[in-house]
Amino acid sequence: GETLRFPDRAAVDTLPLQHPNGATGYRFAHKGRIACYISDIEHSEPWPPADLVRFVRDADLVIYDGMFSEEEYPRCRGWGHSTWEKGVALCRAANAKALAIFHLHPAHDDAYLLASEGELKAAMASAFVAREGQALAFSAVNEPA
């Protein structure tokens, strides 16, 4: 991947992701906080891959593609999407603090997503299903000079 650096010491790193049409993951670092955006990813076995674990290591938030349920995934293998369970496994391996599941299947209604979020929170208390219009804020932490 590539890295963009900005005068205010913000950095954006990229990582190619496994997807039939190609995709890119992003790691945003600024003022001691890290957020990673991992969309359009076909998870592989073994999971999670070492390069992705390094990429999201110690992130404050990982925003992850949770298009399918574990039950749906075998029928949709090769479509370039993943499951919330794989997002949890990635976050655990990388010591990420929170997980937002997005890129949701259009056939999954609000009731389904609420039920899934209950399972998600049971697996990782700081995880949630992202919602339209939702905004999150992180306070800056002291950075080394």
For the regions a language model picked out, list residue spans one by one.
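Core dinuclear metal-dependent hydrolase active-site scaffold
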Residues: 1-50, 54-55, 134-145
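Cap/insert and terminal regions of metallo-dependent hydrolase folds
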Residues: 44-133
